[in-house]
């Protein structure tokens, strides 16, 4: 009984540590709006999954309109 309890506790700890770790590997989609007049000139950098730092999410969205494969946001801030 004691061995089973230790095994169960160890399994629960390992599962909680693994959690959602794979969700951030690819990145998240940019929140794109239909900017008719272009993007705002606000510097709020994001790092794309292509390794490029974009000045803001809007500029990443504009880049995605030109690409076949969309770039995701790997992290907030510069690459």
Curated annotation (Swiss-Prot):
The record marks 43-44 as: Necessary for sperm binding. GO terms for biological process: negative regulation of calcium ion import; negative regulation of nitric oxide mediated signal transduction; nitric oxide mediated signal transduction; regulation of acrosome reaction; regulation of store-operated calcium entry; sperm capacitation. One of its GO terms (molecular function) is serine-type endopeptidase inhibitor activity. Its main location: secreted. Residues 1-23 form the signal peptide. It is found in: Secreted. Disulfide bonds join 32-61, 39-58, 47-79. GO terms for cellular component: extracellular space. Keywords: Disulfide bond, Protease inhibitor, Secreted, Serine protease inhibitor, Signal. SUPFAM superfamilies: Kazal-type serine protease inhibitors. The record marks 41-42 as: Reactive bond for trypsin. The keyword Cell membrane does not apply. Residues 26-79 form the Kazal-like domain. Serine protease inhibitor which exhibits anti-trypsin activity. In the pancreas, protects against trypsin-catalyzed premature activation of zymogens. This is Serine protease inhibitor Kazal-type 1. It comes from Bos taurus (Bovine).
């Amino acid at each position: 009984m004691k061995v089973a309890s230790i095994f169960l506790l160890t399994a629960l700890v390992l599962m909680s540590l693994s959690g959602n770790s794979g969700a951030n590997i690819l990145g998240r989609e940019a929140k794109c709006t239909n900017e008719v007049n272009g993007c705002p000139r606000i510097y709020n950098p994001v790092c794309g999954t292509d390794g490029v730092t974009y000045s803001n999410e809007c500029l990443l969205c504009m880049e995605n309109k030109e690409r076949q494969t969309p770039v995701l946001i790997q992290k907030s801030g510069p690459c």
